[in-house]
Amino acid sequence: MSLFDTINSGGTQLLGVAWPTVWALVRILVVAVVILLCVAYLILWERKLIGWMHVRLGPNRVGPAGLLQPIADVLKLLLKEVIQPAQASRWIYMVAPIMVVVPAFAVWAVIPFQAGAVLGDINAGLLYAMAVSSIGVYGVILAGWASNSKYAFLGAMRAAAQMVSYEISMGFALVVVLMTAGTLNLSGIVGSQEHGFFASHGLNFLSWNWLPLLPMFVVYFISGIAETNRHPFDVVEGESEIVAGHMIDYSGMAFALFFLAEYINMIVISALAATLFLGGWSAPFGFLSFIPGIVWLVAKVFFLLSVFIWARATFPRYRYDQIMRLGWKIFIPVCVVWLVVVGFWIMSPLNIWK
């Protein structure tokens, strides 16, 4: 019996019919706290990694090796005053950061951490993740409009156009995964990558979707970078043009919520990419299956997050017209072509997803 089963059975005996509600709230709270800690130390890892790429030390003053720097940053932001512009639409101005950060948390309801460990194992998990993650753009638009600033509004318009453009190619990539797996359930998609010729010979990593769906994997991940407005697609908050974009008139914790949502979305994109294309919690080799699945998922997510950071430190920022051209003239045609190719592949005798 697993630890979760033991807790569940003990809680049922202790609280009776109230236990399912209490257990759901406890799991949600634990996941939320873990996500917040991951965001805090992801920011530290980003600063450290970019520092090493720049041949400098990075933050190293607060705590041993700078490990307490995220806590110091949070305390600083908590003590900052939230200043509202005189001409801002007050309620919309305050609601906008919440509308950005809530969907980022909500996506985690359907992401499986290992077999049987998921908050909500619903059959339409993939559709839910795509739909909920698309809501955040409304908060960005409201933030730009409510600030009553031309720079904030320009950043919001850029964000809306960019996020809508790249959601199309991400949607195509998810449709192709759906075609091969035959299910919208994320646990089922991971399970569909655990069988086949290579998996039966212990080479699990060659049976994952990244190999047969490599163009879709590349398109999905790059589109994810654009969706999160990360470098080199960060024209929304281009420091050399419009400073912080839609966040320019925010301060204190209101400003921090936007950054919190950005880094949570980075982890979400990486977790979904690992689940859909890299086998989720599956071990890369059969003889390593004794290691808990959550360890493999965390390792894959950490690798993809490091690629996010590497891209920031390596590539120059794209012009806005180049970003739109990449999304509409390259990614969408590639997705349509590969969608047709995979369709014929599935219908042919060479179908590897049977």
From Swiss-Prot:
Membrane-spanning parts: 25-45, 91-111, 126-146, 170-190, 205-225, 267-287, 290-310, 330-350
Top EC category: translocase
GO biological-process terms attached to the record: aerobic respiration
An MF annotation (GO) of this entry: quinone binding
Membrane topology recorded in Swiss-Prot or TrEMBL: Multi-pass membrane protein
EC nos: 7.1.1.-
InterPro entries from the UniProt entry: NADH_UbQ_OxRdtase_su1/FPO, NADH_UbQ_OxRdtase_su1_CS
Keywords: Cell inner membrane, Cell membrane, Membrane, NAD, Quinone, Translocase, Transmembrane, Transmembrane helix, Ubiquinone
Reaction(s) catalysed by this chain's protein: a quinone + NADH + 5 H(+)(in) = a quinol + NAD(+) + 4 H(+)(out)
Domain of life according to the entry: Bacteria
Annotated signal peptide: none
Localization of this protein: Cell inner membrane
Pfam families recorded: NADHdh
GO terms for cellular component: plasma membrane
Function description: NDH-1 shuttles electrons from NADH, via FMN and iron-sulfur (Fe-S) centers, to quinones in the respiratory chain. The immediate electron acceptor for the enzyme in this species is believed to be ubiquinone. Couples the redox reaction to proton translocation (for every two electrons transferred, four hydrogen ions are translocated across the cytoplasmic membrane), and thus conserves the redox energy in a proton gradient. This subunit may bind ubiquinone.
Subunit annotation: NDH-1 is composed of 14 different subunits. Subunits NuoA, H, J, K, L, M, N constitute the membrane sector of the complex.
Record-stated family: Belongs to the complex I subunit 1 family.
Protein name: NADH-quinone oxidoreductase subunit H
